Amino acid sequence: MNKLQNIRGVAFDLDGTLVDSAPGLAAAVDMALYALELPVAGEERVITWIGNGADVLMERALTWARQERATLRKTMGKPPVDEDIPAEEQVRILRKLFDRYYGEVAEEGTFLFPHVADTLGALHASGLSLGLVTNKPTPFVAPLLESLDIAKYFSVVIGGDDVQNKKPHPEPLLLVASRLGMTPEQMLFVGDSRNDIQAAKAAGCPSVGLTYGYNYGEAIALSEPDVIYDSFNDLLPALGLPHSDNQEIKND
């Protein structure tokens, strides 16, 4: 907790931290797979692939779908499919399809986690500078924040296309700290996955790990963040602000 004593700003991950984006992401992934006549994955499986950006998401989806198709065909006594298109090209095609479909479903398939809006408002009102660091493709980020009515709280927003190296590399966190006018040690980073905690450690930022996110199905404690919270509004007392229980509930 001592690392939280001299905090001047807070930066946040997006997917799995501020928002439950799995419904929209899974829908877009499945529509893209279906368009290529590949097996669809479903939300529960897609959740385990989230966190490293859209290109890696496509690689994971394609690898699984090709293996699943091969297994299904073998079970039915059918020969394997000859892959005329290299995997790299299929990933590129899948990404184009995903971008098209995700643009259609992102807003309706994304929800704020409990306590996020009020807690961000309280942090902003306290004078703390707030930033956002996400591996999500940049074109989707600003419209999503606006649709959720939380864009107004962030002084700096860094998407996955804004840096050469995405999390877990420290580059995006160092960029946000610089733009907020503070040292990494003065900026708390809040996330839900090992990528987030690894990026914070590499950048020299204190970190909070949230237990309710995605994180590839593993406990956030394994990544050893400085602090672990079960609820987003636990940030308030940790930063010397009153803990409000009068918070909004996630709208499913």
Curated annotation (Swiss-Prot):
InterPro entries: HAD-like_hydrolase_sf, HAD-like_sf, HAD-SF_hydro_IA, HAD_2, HAD_sf, PGP-like_dom2, PGPase_prok. It holds the Pfam family HAD_2. Pathway: Organic acid metabolism; glycolate biosynthesis; glycolate from 2-phosphoglycolate: step 1/1. Mg(2+) binds at D13, D15, D192. One of its GO terms (biological process) is carbohydrate metabolic process. One of its GO terms (cellular component) is cytosol. It comes from the Bacteria. SUPFAM superfamilies: HAD-like. Its cofactor is Mg(2+); chloride. The active site is at D13 (nucleophile). The keyword Metal-binding applies. It catalyses: 2-phosphoglycolate + H2O = glycolate + phosphate. The keyword Cell wall biogenesis/degradation does not apply. Its EC number is 3.1.3.18. Keywords: Carbohydrate metabolism, Chloride, Hydrolase, Magnesium, Metal-binding. GO terms for molecular function: metal ion binding; phosphoglycolate phosphatase activity. NCBIfam families: HAD-SF-IA-v1 (TIGR01549), HAD-SF-IA-v3 (TIGR01509), PGP_bact (TIGR01449), PRK13222.1-1 (NF009694), PRK13222.1-2 (NF009695), PRK13222.1-4 (NF009697). Belongs to the HAD-like hydrolase superfamily. CbbY/CbbZ/Gph/YieH family. Specifically catalyzes the dephosphorylation of 2-phosphoglycolate. Is involved in the dissimilation of the intracellular 2-phosphoglycolate formed during the DNA repair of 3'-phosphoglycolate ends, a major class of DNA lesions induced by oxidative stress. Monomer. HAMAP family: GPH_hydrolase_bact. This is Phosphoglycolate phosphatase. It comes from Salmonella paratyphi A (strain ATCC 9150 / SARB42).
